[in-house]
Amino acid sequence: MIPLSIRVPASTANVGPGFDSVGIALSLYLHVVVKEKSNKWQVIHSFDESIPTDDKNLIVSTACKVSPSLSPYIIEVTSNIPLTRGLGSSASAIVAGIELANQLGNLNLTTDQKVQIATNFEGHPDNVAASILGGTVIGALDGKNVSVVRIESKELGVISLIPNEELNTDESRSVLPDVFPFHEAVKASAISNVLVAALCQKKWEVVGEMMERDHFHEPYRLELVPLLPSIRKCAKEFGAYGTALSGAGPSIFILTPYEKRQEIAEQLARVFTSMKVCELEIDHTGITVNKEERIEL
C-alpha cells in the first residue's frame, strides 16, 4: 500500500507579456511516492542519469532545506513533464519538495506559506504558484513579499508544441537585456496590464492579441526559437486565440477555445512534424496529496 503520494502539475509562465508574473497550471504531472524509511535518501526514477538519486536530487534537497531535521526515506518519482522545455519541470520539483517536507515533517504549512517558500527558491512566483494553486495565477515578488491572485479560465483549451531540443533557462535568460529603455518598459507594462484585465474578464480574443505583443522577452529569444512566428501564424489561421513562448522556451504555448483544442492540435501536428504537439488542459486543482496509511516518523 502506498503510504503517501504527491502530485504536482506542470506549468507555463509569462503567457506573453506577463513576464515572471503570469502562470497557468497544465495537465502534465510529477508524481512522488514515499516508499519507506531508510538510513539515507534514495530517489528511484527512470530519468536521465544526470538526475541525482540521492539527497542532491532537487526534490530532496528542497525538502531538507525546508525541514533540516527530516528523516531520510526512499521515494519514487515519475513524471511526464518534459525537462528543460519551458513547462515548469524544476518548479514542480521544488513544489513537490516543499510538500514532502510539509507532510513528513508535520509542518502544517498554509498555502500562502508554500507559495512564499517556493517563490524564494525559484526566484519568481509564476510557475510555482500555478503548480500549487492550479488555474491561472498572477503574482508579484517585491523583495521578500509575494502577492498572488488566482483566477479561473475553464473556457480555455491549451496546446503545447514541444521540440526535441532542450533549452536551459540560464541560456535563455542570457539573451535578455540588462537594461530596458523607459519608454519600452511603459509600453510593455501597458500590454501586460491589458492581458491581466482580459484574463479576469474572460475576453479571450483580447488575451490572444496581448499574448502576441510582448516586449519584455520574446523579441530577444526569437533567435533561440525561430519557429515561433510561423507557428503563431498557423495557429491563428486554425482558430487559436494566441500563441507565446512557454516560459523561457523552447516549447510553444497556445490558447484555444476549449471545444476547438483537438481540431487545432491535429492541424498543427500535420504542419509541424518535427515537434511533439500535445493537446492539454488547464489543471484547476494544483498540488494534491494522497495518504493511504500513516507514515512512521
Curated annotation (Swiss-Prot):
Pathway: Amino-acid biosynthesis; L-threonine biosynthesis; L-threonine from L-aspartate: step 4/5. GO terms for molecular function: ATP binding; homoserine kinase activity. The keyword ATP-binding applies. The keyword ATP-binding applies. Its EC number is 2.7.1.39. It is an enzyme of class 2 (transferase). GO terms for biological process: threonine biosynthetic process. ATP binds at residues 82-92. It is found in: Cytoplasm. InterPro entries: GHMP_kinase_C_dom (IPR013750), GHMP_kinase_C_sf (IPR036554), GHMP_kinase_N_dom (IPR006204), GHMP_knse_ATP-bd_CS (IPR006203), Homoserine_kinase (IPR000870), Ribosomal_Su5_D2-typ_SF (IPR020568), Ribsml_uS5_D2-typ_fold_subgr (IPR014721). It holds the Pfam family GHMP_kinases_N. It catalyses: L-homoserine + ATP = O-phospho-L-homoserine + ADP + H(+). GO terms for cellular component: cytoplasm. Keywords: Amino-acid biosynthesis, ATP-binding, Cytoplasm, Kinase, Nucleotide-binding, Threonine biosynthesis, Transferase. Catalyzes the ATP-dependent phosphorylation of L-homoserine to L-homoserine phosphate. Belongs to the GHMP kinase family. Homoserine kinase subfamily. This is Homoserine kinase. The gene is thrB.
